[in-house]
Structures are given as C-alpha cells and as structure tokens.
C-alpha cells in the first residue's frame, strides 16, 4: 500500500485531501504543524479538528512543533520587512521553509515515507522532455494557490501530491459532505493565518513595532499629515490615510530612512519596470537571456505580459508592456507561461541588491 503523509490544518481542504487519498487506498498519516505561540490559538482549534478528522478516518495523527521555525522564518521576516518599508509576503517563504521542506524531511526521517500531500489548490506534473517537475495553476482559478508555491524545489515537487488541484472548491465541499467530515461546513479561513489569529496585520505588527510619528508628504515634499509608523501602510493604499486632498491620493513610496509616507495620484503609482531578486525557477532551468512571459505581482492580480531580463546577483529586471499600479517591494512576482509556473522572486526596493 502506498504511504503518504498529509498536512492537516483542521480546515475543509486538507481534510478532503486526506479523506480522498484514504478512499483511493493510500496509507494516510496525518501531520499537523504547530506554528504559533501565544495568541495564535487558531492553531489549537485546528489541531483539535485535525485530530478529529484522523480519528474519523482511522489513521494516525502526528503534531510537529515548528513554533521556533515559524518565529525565525516568518515573524522576524515580517517585522524586519515592515520596519524597512517593504510589505513582505510571508506565505511563499512559509511554504518553503516551514511547511513543505520540514514536512517532507519529517516524513522521510521519522515515518519512512517519501510522499506528502496538502490541501493546496495547484497541480504538479512531470515533463519527460525537460525531465523536470512542473508546477501548474489549479483548475479552479478562483482558488488557485500556485502564486504562493513558486519557491518550492524540484525535490519537494517530486515528493508532493495536490489532491485538490483538479477540482473546484464547490466539489471539495460536496466531497466533504459525502464523507460526512466534521469540517464540511467549516468557514473559509483567511489567506494569512496571522490575520486570522490577530484580527489584522496592523494589530500583529503593533506587538513588535513601537509607534513612531512621521510625515505624510506629496511628491514635492509638502507635508499633508502625520502617521504613527510606516508599517501601517503599503504601496497602492488609498484608505486610511487621514488626509484631505482635491483628488484621490495613494501611497506611492515608503521612506524608512526619513520615516515618511509619500503619496501621489494614481498615475504617479504606475511603474513600467522593477527589479526582482531571490529568484527560484521552479519548473524550468534559469534563463540566460531575456524571455517574454506573463507575471503576477499580487495574489489576486491578473497576470500581465512582461519581458524578463536577467542581471547579476540572481536578479532580473521586469519590463511591463503597460505601466502597472501598486508594484510593491516585498511582494512576489511570479512568472507564468499559460498554466505553468516558471518561477518567481521578491520585488526589491530600488536600492536593494540583496541576493
């Protein structure tokens, strides 16, 4: 019998992933990662529900304490990023460094199993021509999570199953009801677990970053108002600025050195190019010459045409066909060729040369 370790969060998606594989004849072992300390009690509820699902399926359940790993790779990453004026994307880093990598290692070392599965909406296939595993968008584009998975390695793709990649969320709910799973009617969780635990990103960050009053200025340096910390703002933000102006104003830059929030009209927030670093080419070999593909610069944004020009230090320059609004340092730029995730990286600040 084929053995698989299924990552269980206690939600309906991972529950159906486990139940479906169990129904297909896999020897399923449930595994839940204990991620958060303190206020993150959503983890406690999730662990209880995950244990219940495993009991319902008649399969073993393991809990792995990854709180220190989560704090080092995610909490510290978020806090330092927001303090420096970027808007970090924790999910892709969490998937690589806290979830998939450690899960697969635990499965191999402790459970003698070389396959893991999760409830993510994405697909994996093997390309015989290139002899590489490819990461693909999910069939359900509304639930597609491939944007958050671009940083996975070939070894992880080889050892991973995404049972939900070929179905819609509605089908997942229906299957959960058919299996009479406890989580069948459980509400949809937040995309970001920290927001679910703390109510908002601002509430979470306020525990780590002290208020620091600064100026909100326009592009000419005219002071329009004040703020209590640049970590409360992100590029493209319009609401919550607390300033009066004859036209809508948006955050176009965060200056951590001067502790300033710089605002302008929508046209001022458009960019025709940007630099992306910390690259991972998940489905193809690293290109040595310019390529023209599509890029997605936010989870919910539309993929748009882009020219990717390799430069030094594991970085590329992105040149957009049309100016793009809200290009945000710290977020991921993920490259697509149709449904195939080619790779991606982190949008850098103009003065950031970090590899």
From Swiss-Prot:
The keyword Nucleotide-binding applies. Keywords: ATP-binding, Cytoplasm, Disulfide bond, Nucleotide-binding, RNA-binding, Transferase, tRNA processing, tRNA-binding. Transmembrane segments: none annotated. Disulfide bonds join 94-193. ATP binds at residues 7-14, 33, 119. It is found in: Cytoplasm. SUPFAM superfamilies: Adenine nucleotide alpha hydrolases-like. Residues 143-145, 298-299 are annotated as: Interaction with tRNA. Pfam families: tRNA_Me_trans, tRNA_Me_trans_C, tRNA_Me_trans_M. CDD domains: MnmA_TRMU-like. It is an enzyme of class 2 (transferase). It comes from the Bacteria. It catalyses: S-sulfanyl-L-cysteinyl-[protein] + uridine(34) in tRNA + AH2 + ATP = 2-thiouridine(34) in tRNA + L-cysteinyl-[protein] + A + AMP + diphosphate + H(+). NCBIfam families: PRK00143.1 (NF001138), trmU (TIGR00420). Belongs to the MnmA/TRMU family. HAMAP family: tRNA_thiouridyl_MnmA. This is tRNA-specific 2-thiouridylase MnmA. It comes from Crocosphaera subtropica (strain ATCC 51142 / BH68). The lineage of its organism: Bacteria, Bacillati, Cyanobacteriota, Cyanophyceae, Oscillatoriophycideae.
């Amino acid at each position: 019998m084929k053995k698989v370790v299924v990552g269980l969060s206690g939600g309906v998606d991972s529950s159906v992933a486990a139940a479906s594989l169990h129904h297909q004849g896999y020897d399923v072992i449930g595994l839940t990662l204990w991620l958060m300390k303190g206020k993150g009690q959503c983890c406690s509820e999730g662990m209880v529900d995950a244990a219940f699902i495993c009991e319902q399926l008649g399969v073993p359940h393991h809990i792995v304490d990854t709180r220190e790993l989560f704090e080092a790779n995610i909490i510290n990453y978020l806090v330092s990023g927001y303090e420096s004026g970027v808007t970090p994307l924790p999910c892709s880093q969490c998937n690589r460094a806290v979830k998939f990598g450690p899960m697969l290692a635990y499965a191999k070392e402790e459970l003698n199993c070389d396959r893991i599965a999760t409830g993510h909406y994405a697909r994996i296939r093997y390309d015989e021509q290139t002899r590489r595993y490819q990461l693909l968008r999910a069939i359900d584009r509304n639930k597609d999570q491939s944007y958050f998975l671009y940083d996975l390695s070939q070894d992880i793709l080889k050892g991973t199953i995404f049972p939900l990649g070929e179905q819609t969320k509605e089908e997942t709910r229906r299957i959960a009801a058919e299996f009479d799973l406890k989580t069948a009617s459980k509400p949809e969780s937040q995309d970001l677990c920290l927001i679910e635990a703390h109510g908002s990103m601002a509430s979470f960050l306020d525990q780590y970053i002290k208020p620091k009053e600064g100026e909100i200025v326009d592009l000419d340096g005219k002071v329009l108002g004040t703020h209590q910390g640049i970590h409360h703002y992100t590029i493209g933000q319009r609401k919550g600025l607390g300033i009066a102006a004859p036209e809508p104003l948006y955050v176009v830059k965060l200056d951590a050195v001067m502790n300033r929030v710089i605002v302008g009209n929508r046209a001022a927030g458009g960019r025709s190019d940007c630099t992306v670093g910390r690259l991972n080419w998940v489905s193809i070999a690293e290109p040595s010459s310019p390529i023209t593909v599509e890029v997605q610069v936010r989870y919910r944004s539309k993929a748009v045409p882009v020219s990717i020009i390799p430069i030094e230090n594991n970085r590329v320059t992105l040149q957009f066909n049309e100016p793009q609004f809200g290009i945000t340092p710290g977020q991921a730029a993920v490259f697509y060729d149709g449904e195939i995730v080619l790779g991606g990286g982190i949008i850098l600040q103009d003065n950031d040369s970090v590899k």
